[in-house]
Amino acid sequence: MIKLFSLFIYLYLISNLKLINTINNTPVIGILTQPFPSSINIKYGDNYLMASYVKYVESAGARVVPIFYNQDDESLTTIFKQINGILLPGGDVDFKTEIQYVKTLTLIWDYVLDVNINGDYFPLWGTCLGLEEIVSLQAESFDVLTDFNAENYSIPLNFSNIALESKIMKNCPTNIINSLANDPITMNNHHFGISPNTFDNNSLLNQFFNVLATNNDKSGNEFISLIESKDYPIYAIIWHPEKSPYSWYSKDATDHSFNAILACQYMSNFFVNETRKSNHKFNDEEVLFKSLIYNYNPTYTFKETHVEQIYIFNTSTNNTKNDFNINQIFSKKLFIIIFILIILFFK
């Protein structure tokens, strides 16, 4: 009997040790870059990433690797196998013309589904445009998206009756739930979205996702604000929590109150905590260091874009705007030094 009891204790300790070992406290999250839209008048660079999304993830204890949308499939898949989750940020992308971007989106979606179906834990998060992308990928059509009058518009959420039992909301503190439900702290800034009616009539969507919150736009039309997958760690929101702590355009309807900051922090903490359950890792530390966002400099772009900071990438040279200018200056100085040395040599 004592031996049996000892065996039970041993198995219990081993199982808990394994559980502890599955928690990854050094998560690395990939954030997808985007092609420059016509609304951003930048004359160089072929990718960009708003710095607020990087800060959003870093504030919850994760590091960031940019996922360049125009990389080849093999390079992208290699990255996916080493990071612990992916964030699809908000932005402005024309799905009809940006073929390579949509191709990369599809690769991401197929990978996320495949590994999660096969028992790997690999979270995906979408914000604003990211929600539109996730529902379109699952519906296998961008036609599920509808026009909405929801730009520069802060409102409370209308939670569904299953929201508080959901993965994303069940551990949310009551004060944050009350703020989200009663205060205008969710900043919407989107032309498109998905209506509950479209969702309910699409089995690819309603069998895959649970709707946790909705809103009404300025014209009274209802759109979906918060969804999560029924079976996998896939989450999407239509509003911009990252704007509350990191965006300061005075004409934006962004709420910067303490409650809005708490709501943002809850969302970022939740997602990053989900990525801690992923056991992906970089086997080569040098590859990790070279991949991190720290290798790039954000550029202050408020005057041009009303967005404080943007990472500008030129994947043909792998430089940011700041790196590019520094290299140019360095090259000019080097040329001058060599020229002077040649003159002195022949004197």
UniProtKB/Swiss-Prot annotation:
- The annotated active site, in chain numbering, is 128 (nucleophile), 240 (proton donor)
**What's the main place this protein lives?**
secreted
Entry keyword set: Glycoprotein, Hydrolase, Secreted, Signal
Q: Give the catalytic activity.
A: (6S)-5,6,7,8-tetrahydrofolyl-(gamma-L-Glu)(n) + (n-1) H2O = (6S)-5,6,7,8-tetrahydrofolate + (n-1) L-glutamate
Q: Tell me the superkingdom of the source.
A: Eukaryota
Signal peptide interval: 1-22
**PROSITE patterns under this entry?**
PEPTIDASE_C26_GGH
| Gamma-glutamyl hydrolase domain span | 23-314
Which PANTHER family did the record assign? FOLATE GAMMA-GLUTAMYL HYDROLASE (PTHR11315:SF0), PROTEASE FAMILY C26 GAMMA-GLUTAMYL HYDROLASE (PTHR11315)
**What is the protein name given in its UniProt record?**
Gamma-glutamyl hydrolase B
Q: Which gene encodes it?
A: gghB
